[in-house]
Amino acid sequence: TEEQIAKIFGQLISGAHVSDHEKWQFKSAMLVYFAHLDHEKGWTQQFHLGALRNNNARLLGSLGPDTGFDSIGDFEQAKPLSKFLNHLDSTNQLAKTILYNLNPGDNELLATMTGNFQDGTIVGKMQFGSSWWFLDQKDGMESQMNALSNMGLLSHFVGMLTDSRSFLSFP
């Protein structure tokens, strides 16, 4: 409820202890809130899924977070993502969405998930975004585009972005 989230927020800003469950509740509420704002504003929401961050505790301690010790994660994504998108869709508040994954084992999962929430209001409303980070290389891009073309429509693909455009220069 809004009251529970307000209470957790109060605890967070006061520095009081917040349980892992309360952190999860707060993060979930914020994610839904921002998704509603994206829909309201007509913005596209983008989710980059699957990064396992700051894996080396020794180097994290000496160099700090986000200094290059990340890897591909193997998180359970299908059920939580489906519940999140379904919640937004069931209230007609699902914004145009692009899903990017970091684990090539999730290609078919995301390619099919995007098909579950197309509604005809916007062509390509749900997109399986281009390969990124560790998959932003020839094999990763081919795997992503093969999954998309096998499970969905390549003609509605949002296209490549950032460094991915350099694939045209590969020998």
Question: Locations of the language-model features?
Answer:
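Active-site beta-loop-alpha junctions enriched in small/polar residues
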Residues: 50-54, 102-104, 131-135, 165
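Histidine/acidic residue-rich metal-binding segments in metalloenzymes
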Residues: 1-96, 105-123, 140-159
